[in-house]
Amino acid sequence: MSTNNQPLAFFYDRHATPSTGILQVRLEACREYAAELRYEVAGEWIDRGDDALSDDRRPQFDAMLDALAGASVDRTVLCLINGWDRLSRDPGRCGHFRYRIHMAGGWTETTTGEDDRPGSTRPRALTAFPFAVVPEAAS
């Protein structure tokens, strides 16, 4: 088991346009936030182009989720995003992506200090659609 008690942050973003200026601003905000809170950075995963516009096909999100799940075995892990809309602009789909992060063993946190960590007393955005584990219907 790891002796490092600092959370391991997995940066995620999506960007549809060829111009990357605003993407770099968002990633720099993640870097600064992680440094301020002393989070160790696992890496950056960015879905680009059509993948960034889809809520169904996110290969970089899936790769990040696999890495996050693997690391969650012996580390505290989180997905760090610049804002909730980096997952999806649709509140329901945003909740779906957050649920997947939760099921992989992590939580989601924004560079403005909002998170969905279980038991957290930090603020949550009103636009961060809540997720719930819904039991499967009996057959």
Labelled PLM ranges:
Residues M1-S139:
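Short, structured surface patches at the beginning of a domain
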